[in-house]
């Protein structure tokens, strides 16, 4: 395992610690998305895909860790801004193949029946949104 992949894992541990959501460690989602990736670059982006949005980690922390511009751009693209409408964000992701691949894996993990059954919010709405997003992103591949 490379130093950068180890750094990504360390950042995930720092970002999420012992946080639990829907009955499981929050970081498990990042590791499942990583497991669906082929290359180390994809694995790193998969691990980091939510850290800017769901923790105190900042973009400069990723830069300081030595991740490539391509990795940082993908993580940044995967971070949805509050002012951006969700499906506009999904459409924008289609411009970045690395971010698209990670988002597809994330959506599939979000739609996993076992995970959905543990979620405490509107799962049907989530499933519909995930499926529509998958259709957009898979059409871009």
Locations of regions flagged by a protein language model:
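Active-site helical microenvironments for divalent-metal-assisted chemistry
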Residues: 1-141
């Amino acid at each position: 395992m490379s130093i950068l992949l180890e750094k990504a894992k360390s950042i995930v541990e720092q970002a999420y610690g012992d946080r639990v959501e829907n009955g499981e460690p929050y970081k498990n989602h990042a590791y499942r998305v990583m497991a669906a990736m082929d290359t180390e670059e994809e694995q790193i982006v998969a691990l980091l895909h939510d850290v800017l949005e769901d923790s105190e980690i900042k973009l400069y922390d990723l830069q300081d860790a030595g991740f490539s511009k391509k990795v940082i751009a993908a993580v940044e693209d995967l971070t949805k801004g509050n002012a951006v409408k969700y499906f506009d964000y999904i459409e924008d992701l289609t411009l970045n193949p690395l971010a698209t691949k990670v988002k597809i894996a994330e959506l599939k993990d979000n739609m996993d029946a076992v995970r959905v059954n543990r979620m405490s919010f509107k799962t049907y709405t989530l499933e519909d949104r995930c499926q529509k997003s998958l259709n957009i992103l898979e059409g871009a591949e």
